[in-house]
Amino acid sequence: MTLMDGRAIAAQIKLEITKEVQQIVINGEKKPHLAAILVGHDCSSETYVANKVKTCEELGFQSTLIRYESDLIENKLLATVEKLNQDSNIDGFIIQLPLPKHISEQKVIEAIDYKKDVDGFHPVNAGRMAIGLPCFVPATPAGILELLKRYKITTAGKHCVVLGRSNIVGKPIANLLMRKAYPGDCTVTVCHSRTKNILKHCLEADIIIAAMGVPEFLKGNMVKDGVVVIDVGTTRVLSTETDSGFKLRGDVRFKEVAPKCSYISPVPGGVGPMTIISLMRNTLLARKKVIYS
């Protein structure tokens, strides 16, 4: 069993991005600039945004954090989005989800200029990805692809089971793994909360992407020997073992599943670091206008 070390791979990509940023500066050009909007005080969102800002600093990016209280009205947020759309100094920006319930996430996402949508959530980017055109790929699916690529996992002709159908992970990674490129050319089965015989599907899988958001959903009796398992789950659970009083738990019961795997990603330290670095790479692509001129 090989542990897929997302931290180590992300560190390699950091070096690659840092060199590109240094060259941009040497050429007398503007550093990549990522902005983030955070509404409210959700603990997970606070942590994620702090990590993104920290990574920007490490890479030599410029970053801007815009904070609002949870009682922010929708129109004010939409006005901020439009301001960022028009700001030529901002290469890309994200809106940290989830938003308070009184704000329509879809309406806000659709208000973003798709050329600055480095999260890859805008319908234009989602549609272009679906038909194989250049676009900003959502960060978590992009990170998963990079793990498969860096560990040289064979995907062509393999049966991949995706557990979960969210717009952020499940649907896009299923689409990407079907594309005519590496990593891809998989036969993909998407399972979700209404799927019958999930056990049967999982036992037939060569690759499993676990993104249900259910702690330890995938157990040892659900996988065959030699399977590749990528755990996307990051549920915060109470714990007396940590100073913070909680720990992250993945969608895979690691101790049972890992011995049967050829490759497996851990939680934490697997997909998480890859997600953040993939967002940074999207920001660099936006700065260089590689995808959209």
From Swiss-Prot:
Sorted UniProt keywords: Amino-acid biosynthesis, Histidine biosynthesis, Hydrolase, Methionine biosynthesis, Multifunctional enzyme, NADP, One-carbon metabolism, Oxidoreductase, Purine biosynthesis
CDD domains documented for this protein: NAD_bind_m-THF_DH_Cyclohyd
Enzyme Commission (EC) number: 1.5.1.5, 3.5.4.9
GO BP terms in the entry: L-histidine biosynthetic process; methionine biosynthetic process; purine nucleotide biosynthetic process; tetrahydrofolate interconversion
Matching PANTHER family: C-1-TETRAHYDROFOLATE SYNTHASE, CYTOPLASMIC, C-1-TETRAHYDROFOLATE SYNTHASE, CYTOPLASMIC-RELATED
Assigned protein family: Belongs to the tetrahydrofolate dehydrogenase/cyclohydrolase family.
Protein's UniProt name: Bifunctional protein FolD
Lineage: Bacteria, Pseudomonadati, Bacteroidota, Bacteroidia, Bacteroidales
